[in-house]
Swiss-Prot record:
Family under the similarity heading: Belongs to the methyltransferase superfamily. RNA methyltransferase RsmG family.
Basic and acidic residues composition bias: residue spans: 219-254
GO CC annotation terms, alphabetical: cytosol
Enzyme Commission identifier(s): 2.1.1.-
Name of the protein in its database record: Ribosomal RNA small subunit methyltransferase G
């Protein structure tokens, strides 16, 4: 386990005056992150491009002044790079595992983000987030769940008109083709794929962008609460059950700036 490589020019362009904080974050990923099992030891040499910059370029598609939640934040990816790249965006790092939350709290303090970023332990239903609690303008997620399930998890966490930004791999268009019908039924419209970071990184970041409909019908709303296909209701019950288990255990490619609607 060694230190990460020096920050590339793309990092200076992306993080600007916060480059030193991004360097500190990357160093923590390479040391404490590896020691605590949040980052694989083989990832150290590619932390900048594969993780930090890869996540930070989400800044290109986050609305100005957004109130965002990073769902299943893990090592702080993508939430912390997003916050570093966008000082105007407030970020909540939502993470169910206590040991990961401790790491995130240490990182937030070490990089000086206490006024912009907060750490919340739990899952959406039992963390005061959702239909009966706080809702966000943006929800970001990286490698959390298949798209159909992810859509069901994130929909009740967002305000009407809120945006889901799901980082996916090279098969994003195939995934979307399979999940398109379910996402529409859940209440996501429009849905498209955007590419972030072109010209900054060798492999740009592919993001599924979906907007929560602001004009759901009553019938659609009931589906979200458990009628019909019951995507939302079923997921809320599942995540609540998973949360209890968690506490017991541990405690295709458009050009830059363009999108492909589906």
């Amino acid at each position: 386990m060694g230190p990460p490589p020096a920050a590339p020019a793309a990092a200076a362009e992306l993080f600007g005056p916060r480059l030193a904080a991004a360097e500190r974050f990357t160093e923590l990923l390479a040391t404490a992150g590896v020691e605590r099992g949040l980052i694989g030891p083989r990832e150290t040499d590619r932390l900048w491009e594969r993780h930090v910059i890869n996540c930070g370029v989400l800044a290109e598609v986050v609305p100005e002044g957004a109130d965002a939640v990073d769902v299943g934040s893990g090592a702080g990816l993508p939430g912390i790079p997003l916050a570093l790249a966008r000082p105007d965006v407030r970020v909540v790092l939502l993470e169910p595992m206590e040991r990961r939350c401790r790491f995130l709290q240490e990182v937030v303090a070490a990089v000086g983000l206490e006024e912009q970023v907060s750490v919340l332990r739990g899952r959406a239903p039992d963390a005061g987030i959702g239909p009966e609690g706080r809702r966000f303008g943006v929800a970001v997620a990286r490698a959390v769940a298949p798209l159909e399930r992810l859509g069901a998890i994130l929909l009740p966490m967002l305000q009407p008109g809120g945006v889901m930004l799901a980082m996916r791999g090279s098969r994003i268009l195939e995934e979307l083709q399979d999940a398109r019908g379910s996402l529409g039924t859940q209440g996501w419209h429009p849905v498209d794929v955007v590419v972030c970071g072109e010209g900054r990184v060798d492999e740009p970041t592919r993001v599924l962008r979906a907007v929560r409909s602001s004009q759901l019908s009553r019938a659609e709303g009931r589906k979200g609460r458990g009628d019909g296909e019951r995507h939302d209701g079923r997921q809320v019950r599942r995540t609540a059950r998973d949360s209890r288990r968690s506490r017991e255990v541990d405690r295709d490619q458009p050009t830059r700036g363009q999108s492909r609607s589906t």
